[in-house]
A protein has these predicted regions:
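S-adenosyl-L-methionine-dependent methyltransferase catalytic module, highlighting the catalytic core
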Residues: 137-141, 150-151, 159-249
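Conserved alpha-helix/loop element of class I SAM-dependent methyltransferases that forms part
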Residues: 33-56
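Class I SAM-dependent methyltransferase SAM/SAH-binding core
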Residues: 67-138
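Conserved beta-strand positions in the Rossmann-like core of class I SAM-dependent methyltransferases
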Residues: 59, 80, 176
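Conserved class I S-adenosyl-L-methionine
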Residues: 56-64
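Alpha-helix C-terminal capping/helix-to-coil transition sites in glycosyltransferase folds
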Residues: 54, 145-146, 171
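N-terminal, positively charged/glycine-rich alpha-helical extensions of SAM-dependent methyltransferases
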Residues: 1-28
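Short amphipathic alpha-helix with an adjacent loop that forms part of the alpha/beta core around
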Residues: 49, 138-145
Length: 249
């Protein structure tokens, strides 16, 4: 049973200058707003595993500016997104405190602007999508049950990605996982630690093989029918991503 009280009240955001757009968006009344990071336009269905969203209740982990939220909604989904609170901010890689402080302050500002971009877009689309601000590692049962859970390029940013998959697997019958492709890891169910002392990759924890996910999904009783590979644009450059869809029998 869903408890509607846990969902955030929509915020009124009037000024696009108060927003950080993670995705390039085409907003009614505003035209194209260039995103700082990803442009997924024209390749959304591949990104989402070519799944039919009509009439489906969807749990989305990490909506950012809401591009996928509203694309799924256009395809007939009822979407609930989970986003971190201001307190959590980000799952920071634990570099020395003095060094990490360089990232924490600016990141808090960006996260607030990112949430603003979601609500700005939400209003422009006259969306009915809902947001829960909380701990992604401990999702409340009050969110209810879902047909599909979507984890789109978020697990690489999380210390404990398997915990998130487990949480989603308890709430949804189908799981969509999209992440960066690393061909050198293929052939074994492995993940590789991404940050080093030199690269200061405070925001990214892991590189994954596809088998890392398919084996864990199988452990949880999910069958993966196929794995799609597709090209998406990040900061003007093409990258290869994979999407897999697991379904519980």
């Amino acid at each position: 049973m869903t408890d509607e009280k846990i969902f955030a009240t929509p915020r009124k955001v009037d000024n696009v200058a108060d927003c950080y757009f993670y995705h390039t968006m085409e907003l009614p009344g505003h035209g194209v707003i260039e995103g700082r990071d990803w442009d997924l336009r024209g390749r959304v269905d591949d990104y989402l595993g070519n799944v039919d969203f009509a009439g489906q209740r969807v749990l989305e982990i990490g909506p950012a500016s809401g591009f996928l939220t509203f694309e799924m909604e256009k395809r007939g989904a009822d979407v609930v997104s989970v986003e971190v609170t201001a307190e959590h901010g980000w799952d920071f890689v634990p570099y020395p405190a003095a060094k990490l402080e360089e990232a924490i302050g600016p990141r808090r500002i960006v996260m607030q602007q990112l949430k603003n971009s979601y609500w700005f877009s939400h209003a422009a689309h006259q969306s009915k999508a809902k947001v829960y601000y909380g701990d992604v590692y401990n999702l409340p049962t009050a969110l209810g049950q879902f047909d599909i859970a979507v984890m789109g390029s978020v697990l690489l940013h999380c210390r404990d990605p398997l915990r998130i998959i487990e949480q989603c697997g308890k709430m949804a019958r189908s799981l969509i996982i999209t992440d960066m492709s690393h061909p050198d890891l293929e052939g074994a169910p492995v993940c590789r630690l991404a940050p080093t002392p030199q690269n200061f990759l405070w925001h990214t924890w892991w590189h994954f093989s596809t088998q890392f996910f398919t084996q864990f999904l199988a452990v949880m009783g999910f069958t993966t029918s196929e794995i799609l590979r597709h090209q998406q644009r990040h900061r003007g450059r093409p990258y290869t991503l994979f999407t897999l869809v697991g379904r519980r029998e």
